[in-house]
Amino acid sequence: MATNLLCLSNKLSSPTPTPSTRFPQSKNFITQKTSLANPKPWRVICATSSQFTQITEHNSRRSANYQPNLWNFEFLQSLENDLKVEKLEEKATKLEEEVRCMINRVDTQPLSLLELIDDVQRLGLTYKFEKDIIKALENIVLLDENKKNKSDLHATALSFRLLRQHGFEVSQDVFERFKDKEGGFSGELKGDVQGLLSLYEASYLGFEGENLLEEARTFSITHLKNNLKEGINTKVAEQVSHALELPYHQRLHRLEARWFLDKYEPKEPHHQLLLELAKLDFNMVQTLHQKELQDLSRWWTEMGLASKLDFVRDRLMEVYFWALGMAPDPQFGECRKAVTKMFGLVTIIDDVYDVYGTLDELQLFTDAVERWDVNAINTLPDYMKLCFLALYNTVNDTSYSILKEKGHNNLSYLTKSWRELCKAFLQEAKWSNNKIIPAFSKYLENASVSSSGVALLAPSYFSVCQQQEDISDHALRSLTDFHGLVRSSCVIFRLCNDLATSAAELERGETTNSIISYMHENDGTSEEQAREELRKLIDAEWKKMNRERVSDSTLLPKAFMEIAVNMARVSHCTYQYGDGLGRPDYATENRIKLLLIDPFPINQLMYV
């Protein structure tokens, strides 16, 4: 099978030549130095960039035939939410205090409190009540030591999941009591849909080697599917189907909150306050996100790369959606802006390496990034000059903003992430150009870097660390040496991408992705078998991340760990039904509308 796939790859490796574009020669570059009047790192502008026009090049170049941008500048600038924000903020503040009192009530039964915390979390309000939730969970742990009422599968599984999600060390052995004499899970649980669903969700918080949780997952999936076949309540069936498609732990939580807002039914009358707060908060945070998106669309349009280079993806909206997925909470605006800018450039430069550039040109560009010297532009072809200057200016500006706001000297870490990224891009280009299929382990080692994850996580780390003393050597080593939580998140990013994009890459003549490498190395393996092995690898990386999040030796800031985990989640989301970045489909468009365009329907007259 691998041989046949390689033959197919060779047939497709020389696509029909398509016209492409280049730019007329321009030598008018101006360098801005750091000074009291201009206190930024070296920044270079192109004095005549507005004079560049697209012209057809006679030399043949490949094209990925990306679909046009769905969201133009005028549309993004027209986004306007008519919320009466001041009035809504007043109401939200009052509701927030009432919900806080609900969480902190000492007479609430443990299960009711756990369900309330789960609702708060699923409705996207964790960031408002983080300290209250931790305190409540600590009290539940203490209570649990004295009251061994653990016969309820739903209560046990929900407690286990929430505790692990929030960094508590809790043993998988809490599920031993639900086993029968033969060592399997008791048959009496087969009809407990609520308990099975909670057990299923809890099983995705497992660590490597926790076989009991693997058994729990298999058992719960089997009997949840059986219950669906036999027929259960329509609303419950919808929840079960939704969970079986992708567990909550791996879902994009901001998007999940929007889904849950439509489904939530308060368990008690006073929980209506929680729903009301969640609706208001969703819309107010959406307004903030829209304003950020408009600012970034002006930056993107002014930079002009997507309009000048017709072979690249013009995907600002999708890139901002990714940044929002990594850092959704309102206080992380600077992080979202930095990630959007870095990822926007990643998509452009990735297309230069994957689609357009010759090997000689790509080597020159890689050398220029390695030097990080503006004079290196003299060695580059015109289209690469714009790419390099855009990268040089944006990274320097991002570094300057972080230095100004947080006092972190971070430029060397940001530039290192780009040096490593471009070298990984170049390696893939060499493999593809020479029709080499690397060993799977060698491919994955390089591909986890070429995922671009570190280029996104590096500015994220410095953006969320509030003070210079928050910077730890351990965290910096994770970024520079590429290990632990950072590596796992990047591997998941890459494998999710490969599962979705391998067919299109094969059509372009590329032979370097994980599916092809795995099939080539394991002769006789079918494509579906290779895909299943990649899914197992993704699951293994999730278990590593789960372990590190509760490890006493972890010195990474909690906010950064959540952002790294969120990068894995947004990878699942973006590539769940296909290539949501390269070829956005209806699902991608609908998700963007839910989070960034359409507010949740509320009656504002209630708050006037």
Curated annotation (Swiss-Prot):
Cofactor, free-text remark: Binds 3 Mg(2+) or Mn(2+) ions per subunit.
Motif DDXXD motif, chain ranges: 350-354
Record: residues binding Mg(2+) 1: D350, D354
Transit peptide, residues from-to: 1-45
Keyword Lyase carried by entry: yes
Reaction catalysed by this enzyme: dimethylallyl diphosphate = isoprene + diphosphate
Recorded superkingdom: Eukaryota
Keywords: Chloroplast, Lyase, Magnesium, Metal-binding, Plastid, Transit peptide
Amino acids binding Mg(2+) 2: D350, D354
GO cellular component labels: chloroplast
Coiled coil stretches, renumbered: none
Residue numbers binding Mg(2+) 3: N497, T501, E505
Annotated CDD domains: Terpene_cyclase_plant_C1
Keyword Lyase carried by entry: yes
Residues annotated as signal peptide: none
MF terms (GO), sorted A to Z: isoprene synthase activity; magnesium ion binding
Stored PANTHER family: OS04G0344100 PROTEIN-RELATED, TERPENE SYNTHASE 9-RELATED
Its biological purpose: Lyase that catalyzes the formation of isoprene from dimethylallyl diphosphate.
Stated name of the protein: Isoprene synthase, chloroplastic
Source species: Pueraria montana var. lobata
Gene behind the chain: ISPS
